[in-house]
């Protein structure tokens, strides 16, 4: 009877994951495919979030087991760095770049800036503060793709990370900002807690998968 109960528990084990929408879209399908091959009896409950701080809040409240997000100031999180994303200026196609391959942060000064929703302003403001820049910010409560479309219609300019703009750049021009600005993406678990074997195996899949990103452009 105990053996049957143990088998049942193993079959119904679930890992709860909270991930940024961009990570859930572009990373998680391959990661979960690899994980399922080595842990077929472990279920995964994937929750997609659009707010930069929400994964950390869910982890802190015990509502998720693993998070995929950008590094934030949360002391109760065991953090594993995975990838450094470049930040890009999002500009209308007709913006006068004059053959430049980078966009100076100083050039955001005084321009109409469409601030992506979901507290991505944390990363934007960090870049602006280093450069001493003050843009004319307008927060827009729409998804990243809509912000990009708005830029394409000449309603302002913006700044986003690599994964945020992936596959949505036909109507705009995207160039890295200068000086180079990054946000660190990583995996987080509860601090000071021994990870179950299933989560350790998931972590191995994640680390192995993201190793292939070094030097790759999205």
Q: Where do the language-model regions lie?
A:
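Short, well-ordered beta-strand segments
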Residues: 14-18, 67, 90, 114, ...
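Secondary-structure junction motif
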Residues: 97, 111-132, 195-203, 213-218
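Alpha-helical linker/hinge and terminal dimerization helices associated
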Residues: 1-8, 206
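Central regulatory/effector-binding core of bacterial HTH transcription factors
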Residues: 12-74, 141
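A late-sequence structural motif
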Residues: 173-218
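Flexible hinge/capping segments at coil-to-helix
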Residues: 8-9, 76-87, 91-113, 196-197
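Hydrophobic hinge/microswitch elements
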Residues: 50-55, 60-63, 119-173
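Short beta-strand->loop
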Residues: 78-88, 139, 162-163, 170-184
């Amino acid at each position: 009877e105990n053996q049957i109960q143990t088998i049942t528990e193993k079959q119904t084990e679930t890992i709860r994951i909270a991930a940024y929408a961009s990570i859930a879209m572009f990373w998680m399908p391959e990661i979960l495919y690899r994980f399922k091959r080595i842990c077929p009896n472990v279920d995964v409950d994937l929750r997609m979030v659009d707010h930069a701080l929400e994964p950390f809040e869910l982890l802190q409240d015990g509502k998720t087991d693993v998070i995929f997000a950008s590094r934030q100031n949360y002391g109760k999180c065991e953090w594993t760095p995975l990838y450094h994303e470049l930040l890009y200026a999002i500009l209308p196609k007709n913006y006068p770049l004059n053959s430049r391959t980078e966009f100076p942060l100083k050039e955001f000064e005084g321009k109409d800036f469409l601030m992506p929703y979901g507290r991505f302003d944390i990363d934007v403001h960090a870049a602006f503060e280093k450069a001493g820049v003050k843009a004319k910010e307008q927060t827009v409560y729409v998804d990243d793709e809509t912000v990009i479309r708005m830029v394409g219609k000449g309603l302002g300019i913006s700044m986003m990370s690599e994964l945020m703009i992936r596959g949505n750049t036909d109507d705009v021009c995207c160039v890295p900002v200068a000086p180079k600005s990054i946000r660190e993406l990583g995996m987080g678990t509860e601090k000071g807690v021994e990870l179950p074997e299933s989560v350790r195996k998931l972590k191995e899949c994640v680390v192995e998968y993201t190793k292939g990103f070094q030097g790759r452009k999205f």
